[in-house]
């Protein structure tokens, strides 16, 4: 009987297990939660979203939007769950995190080809295996992986934003609007005057953070930089970043505020909201104090505080092939954020590729590397060919794919991106029947 072990039921591991199971392969899916928890998880559900509830842009003029559509073409479980659990978010795809994880969990637990083991694996097993344990891999398995790779992990710090009780937001002081009125009005906006912003910034840069351990250097991924670190770079960093007011005119005044804090719906009932871009490592008391300086949030109750955790990843250029197989053991695959792809969708996409290729391997077919013209292929190529000493995690972006042939120099970005998207989706068609 053809069997594959998948370690970790996060986004990547869940997607890999689904791709294997739907191809008739028996899957042993190991997830140590709830027997052993991580510093960032709160539930025992598969594919739990530990940071934002947003899977980012949904349009084909955005690289991650193209990646999502490629995955839909390949019957992605994660994308199906996201589409079913979506909540209003303008031009983005955001989800009710409970419904999303619940759908993934039930689908896999009820699949006849999936056997779930709630236990910790402390060493890499023999036989076809996909390691998708994520950036918070347990200490014992980390040691086993270090022995296999022969080198220490690389790492950076990741942070999550607080989530608020929607009933404690003063609706008289906030307004519903998406930036530039793109899509449906999906964000609650808290406008600030210059005086309010200056006071807020001054208090934020004085706020106490949770100290790192002595041996940990502060290395952050720019896409998930703690809010207080951004603030320390100067007030304009916030005004041109998460608090930029452009395209968010206040309907009461018809004018653009000096600064805006956006709140994104976090569940389908619309009772919870997260603060967009407010991932933080402030002490909990400080989080409450700082958030209550924001107009409309003076009495806001925090239902989940922001946290920061250390994310580890392997040196994929030295370790992996574009098929996500290891270079030295062809029946061992890695997938997810630990490979250096950064983001929910990117992690799931790597699991999709690893799952397809592990299924092909046990069925004695040659594993495939997706074309570099596709976003899935471009990411796999990037993480496996970048100069090892300069390797850092990467989001999906159009800079990873080959340029268009011909005269594109004067082409506007939306037009160029539309052509790149069309090319990618045409290229992925050859792989939809695998």
Swiss-Prot record:
Compartments where located: Cytoplasm
This enzyme's EC code(s): 2.1.1.74
Positions annotated to bind FAD: 8-13
Catalytic activities: uridine(54) in tRNA + (6R)-5,10-methylene-5,6,7,8-tetrahydrofolate + NADH + H(+) = 5-methyluridine(54) in tRNA + (6S)-5,6,7,8-tetrahydrofolate + NAD(+); uridine(54) in tRNA + (6R)-5,10-methylene-5,6,7,8-tetrahydrofolate + NADPH + H(+) = 5-methyluridine(54) in tRNA + (6S)-5,6,7,8-tetrahydrofolate + NADP(+)
Gene3D superfamilies (alphabetical): FAD/NAD(P)-binding domain
Keywords attached to this entry: Cytoplasm, FAD, Flavoprotein, Methyltransferase, NAD, NADP, Transferase, tRNA processing
Classification via InterPro entries: FAD/NAD-bd_sf (IPR036188), MnmG-rel (IPR002218), MnmG_N (IPR040131), TrmFO (IPR004417)
Record's keyword annotation contains Methyltransferase: yes
EC class (word): transferase
Family label: Belongs to the MnmG family. TrmFO subfamily.
The protein's role, per its UniProt record: Catalyzes the folate-dependent formation of 5-methyl-uridine at position 54 (M-5-U54) in all tRNAs.
PANTHER family: GLUCOSE INHIBITED DIVISION PROTEIN A, METHYLENETETRAHYDROFOLATE--TRNA-(URACIL-5-)-METHYLTRANSFERASE TRMFO
The protein's name in its UniProt record: Methylenetetrahydrofolate--tRNA-(uracil-5-)-methyltransferase TrmFO
Species the sequence originates in: Exiguobacterium sibiricum (strain DSM 17290 / CCUG 55495 / CIP 109462 / JCM 13490 / 255-15)
Lineage: Bacteria, Bacillati, Bacillota, Bacilli, Bacillales
């Amino acid at each position: 009987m053809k069997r594959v072990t998948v370690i970790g039921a996060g986004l990547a591991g869940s997607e890999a297990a689904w791709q294997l199971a739907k191809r008739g392969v028996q899957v042993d899916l190991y997830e140590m939660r709830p027997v052993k928890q991580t510093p960032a998880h709160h539930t025992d559900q598969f594919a739990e979203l530990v940071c934002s509830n947003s899977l980012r842009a949904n349009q084909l003029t955005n690289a991650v939007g193209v990646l999502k559509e490629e995955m839909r073409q390949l019957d992605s479980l994660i994308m199906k769950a996201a589409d079913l659990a979506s909540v209003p978010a303008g031009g983005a795809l955001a989800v009710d995190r409970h419904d999303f994880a619940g759908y993934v969990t039930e689908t896999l637990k009820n699949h006849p080809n999936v056997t779930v083991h709630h236990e910790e694996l402390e060493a890499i097993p023999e036989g076809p295996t996909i390691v998708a344990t994520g950036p918070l891999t347990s200490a014992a398995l980390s040691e086993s992986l270090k022995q296999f790779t022969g080198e220490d992990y690389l790492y950076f710090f990741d942070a999550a934003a607080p989530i608020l009780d929607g009933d404690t937001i003063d609706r008289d002081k906030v307004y519903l609007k998406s930036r530039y009125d793109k899509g449906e009005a999906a964000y609650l906006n808290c406008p600030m005057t210059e005086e309010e912003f200056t006071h807020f910034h001054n208090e934020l840069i004085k706020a106490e953070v949770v100290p790192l351990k002595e041996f940990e250097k502060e290395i952050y991924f720019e896409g998930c930089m703690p809010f207080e670190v951004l603030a320390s770079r100067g007030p304009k960093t916030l005004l041109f970043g998460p608090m930029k007011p452009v395209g968010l005119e206040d309907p009461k005044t018809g004018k653009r505020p000096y600064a805006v804090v956006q709140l994104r719906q976090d569940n389908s009932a619309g009772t919870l909201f997260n603060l967009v871009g407010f991932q933080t490592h402030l002490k909990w008391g400080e989080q409450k104090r700082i958030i209550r300086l924001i107009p409309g949030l003076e009495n806001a109750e925090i239902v989940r505080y922001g946290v920061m955790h250390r994310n580890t990843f392997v040196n994929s250029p030295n370790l992996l092939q574009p098929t996500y197989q290891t270079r030295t053991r062809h029946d061992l695959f890695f997938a997810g954020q630990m490979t250096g792809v950064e983001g929910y969708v990117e992690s799931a996409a790597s699991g999709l590729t690893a799952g397809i290729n592990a299924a092909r391997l046990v069925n004695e077919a040659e594993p495939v590397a997706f074309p570099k013209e596709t976003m899935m292929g471009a990411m796999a190529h990037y993480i496996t060919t970048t100069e090892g000493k300069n390797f850092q995690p990467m989001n999906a972006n159009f800079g990873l794919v080959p340029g268009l042939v011909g005269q594109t120099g004067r082409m506007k970005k939306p037009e160029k991106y539309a052509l790149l998207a069309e090319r990618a989706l045409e290229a992925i068609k050859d792989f939809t029947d695998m």
